[in-house]
């Protein structure tokens, strides 16, 4: 399916390239595609604009599209292949919230679905809008805990020089 969507994306780009360029439209689209075929394991793919794709693995159990640089460190430090699904969902929300905190162009609504292996249906959906109490509570708690962790960090063990000799530590 990922190959099919990638091929269709490439065909649309080739077909409409003249008009897209004429109107100065930068046609870039990435897709997250996840699901399960009966009798197989669930799969998750990231399909890129040119049509190529990568698959989530045990080593890389999550994929991200859009503004990724602000929220990815939380995912990298928290998510493993064996992280429970509910914890992954909370981490995804923290990742998005961190991105919203650092980039004003990113904001609600946040739509999230959670798929359980072999259920063959989406039973869990979530939409968080601006001012949602859960989103506000999550942000407040996260900021408090990050501040507490920061304050608990050990002090830097500086090397102290007691003489006044000047030494150039910069390299030209």
Predicted segments, located by residue:
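N-terminal nucleophile
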Residues: 1-172
């Amino acid at each position: 399916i990922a190959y099919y969507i990638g091929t269709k994306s490439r065909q649309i780009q080739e077909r409409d390239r003249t008009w897209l360029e004429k109107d100065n439209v930068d046609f870039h689209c990435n897709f997250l595609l996840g699901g399960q075929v009966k009798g197989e394991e669930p799969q998750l793919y990231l399909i890129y604009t040119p049509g190529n794709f990568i698959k989530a693995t045990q080593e890389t159990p999550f994929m991200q599209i859009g503004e990724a640089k602000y929220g990815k460190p939380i995912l990298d430090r928290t998510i493993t292949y064996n992280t429970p699904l509910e914890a992954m969902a909370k981490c995804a929300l923290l990742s998005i919230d961190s991105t919203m905190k650092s980039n004003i162009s990113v904001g609600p609504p946040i739509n999230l679905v959670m798929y359980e292996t072999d259920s063959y249906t989406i039973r869990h959906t979530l939409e968080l809008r601006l001012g949602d109490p859960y989103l506000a509570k999550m942000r407040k708690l996260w900021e408090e805990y990050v501040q507490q962790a920061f304050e608990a960090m050990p002090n830097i063990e500086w090397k102290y020089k007691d003489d006044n000799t000047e030494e150039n530590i910069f390299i030209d």
